């Protein structure tokens, strides 16, 4: 039995006004080819198929087309909802997808099922667990403090997993089949990126890996970096197939090829997802940024490299966007973001904490707040104009 474990596609993501359609199409084409090359029996998508609950039409088209194309290979597809996915959006096509060799699990309450091989014979028992919304697995109790609510939710998630595993064992019976569980959540020790949202805000930071049942493989989603959890080879995040934030660029992206033999996990192989949209982060003062940009001088690059430029100088030049534009206009790059480095923003805030509002004019307060935002020059000018207009209007009323 062979499966491909993938997650966090985030189809339809708007990345600093840029579409990811071409990247996602290339990934899905590669995934289809990979499934055929390795004669995979099933593909498990562990949540966040879409980036929003109301994905754009092109994202739905990518999803639907992939399902249709995969159906022709005999490979079964399992789609589980993540915290970004809408239950209603996934469920609206669930019945049709069932006729296309695809199982859609959008919410809690789905019992374990037999996952077939390509030839139709039983290959594994699947505990199809999506992102567990608290309202689906616990009832609200009045009078609980924050710690008690956290413990209540932790116990409910643990019980849900343990019950599903017990049901899977009953379904397996005496058959030599592996048990595969899924999940879309943060586990203790997982390394997150900037694009990952906290999903149990104020109640549960992370789920302890030791609370998972002893399934043969646990396919996790939500964390965008591939990693093994708790030193356990069978508990893994595969990560997203493309970088979803600039702090993910430069790191390899994977899909896991998981092989089972005689009802047990045999191997997990990391398959590198090809990069189709180069991205880079440049850090330094203006002189350093200028030097770093030279690496693309006289280079033929298609598509252009998407850049995040972090300025580390103490003085954040007011015309930095214009200077960066002049430096890059003849290079095969596209600057999506120009900002102070995080360390610099923190230093600015720390230095300003010694001042009080009474020492600053209204204009100074606004300008300092505006400088902390990651906006391009036109956006800054528009906000400055709106602020000035509002200030003059208020002055005229008093």
Where are these regions (language model features)?
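Conserved catalytic scaffold of divalent metal-dependent phosphoesterases
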Residues: 92-202
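N-terminal active-site segment of His-dependent metallophosphoesterases
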Residues: 1-68, 72, 380, 385, ...
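Catalytic-core regions built around general acid/base machinery
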Residues: 62-74, 204-214
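Conserved beta-sheet core of the metallophosphoesterase superfamily
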Residues: 187-189, 193-264
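Active-site neighborhood of phospho(di)ester-bond hydrolases with catalytic His/Asp-centered motifs
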Residues: 6-7, 43-48, 76-83, 103-108, ...
């Amino acid at each position: 039995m062979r499966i491909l474990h993938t997650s966090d596609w985030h189809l339809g993501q708007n990345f600093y006004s840029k579409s990811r359609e071409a990247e996602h199409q290339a990934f899905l084409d590669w995934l289809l080819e990979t499934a055929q090359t390795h004669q995979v029996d099933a593909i498990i998508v562990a949540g966040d198929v879409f980036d929003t609950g109301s994905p754009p039409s092109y994202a739905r088209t990518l999803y639907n087309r992939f399902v249709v194309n995969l159906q022709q290979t005999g490979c079964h597809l399992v789609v589980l909802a993540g915290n970004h996915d809408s239950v209603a959006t996934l469920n609206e096509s669930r019945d049709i997808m069932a006729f296309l060799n695809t199982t859609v699990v959008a919410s809690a309450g789905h019992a374990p099922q037999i996952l077939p091989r390509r030839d139709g014979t039983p290959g594994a028992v699947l505990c199809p667990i999506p992102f567990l919304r608290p309202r689906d697995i616990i009832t609200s109790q009045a009078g609980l403090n924050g710690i008690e609510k956290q413990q209540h939710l932790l116990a409910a998630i643990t019980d849900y997993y343990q019950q599903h595993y017990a049901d899977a064992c009953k379904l397996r019976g005496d058959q030599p089949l592996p048990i595969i569980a899924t999940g879309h959540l943060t586990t203790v020790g997982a390394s997150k990126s900037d694009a990952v949202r906290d999903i149990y805000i104020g109640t549960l930071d992370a789920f302890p890996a030791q609370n998972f049942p002893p399934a043969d493989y646990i396919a996790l989603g939500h964390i965008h970096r591939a990693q093994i959890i708790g030193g356990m080879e069978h508990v893994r995040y595969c990560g997203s197939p493309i970088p979803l934030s600039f702090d993910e660029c430069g790191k390899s992206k994977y899909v896991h090829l998981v092989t089972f033999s005689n009802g047990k996990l045999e191997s997990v192989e990391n398959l590198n997802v090809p990069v189709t949209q180069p991205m880079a982060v440049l850090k330094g003062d203006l002189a350093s940024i200028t030097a770093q940009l030279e690496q693309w001088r006289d280079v033929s690059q298609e598509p252009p490299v998407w850049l995040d430029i972090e300025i580390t100088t103490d003085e954040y030049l007011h015309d930095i966007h214009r200077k960066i534009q002049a430096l890059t206009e003849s290079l095969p790059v596209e600057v999506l973001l120009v900002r102070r480095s995080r360390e610099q923003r923190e230093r600015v805030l720390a230095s300003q904490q010694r001042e009080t509002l009474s020492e600053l004019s209204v204009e100074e307060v606004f300008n300092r707040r505006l400088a902390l935002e990651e906006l391009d020059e036109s956006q800054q000018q528009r906000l400055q104009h709106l602020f000035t207009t509002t200030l003059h209007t208020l002055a005229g009323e008093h």
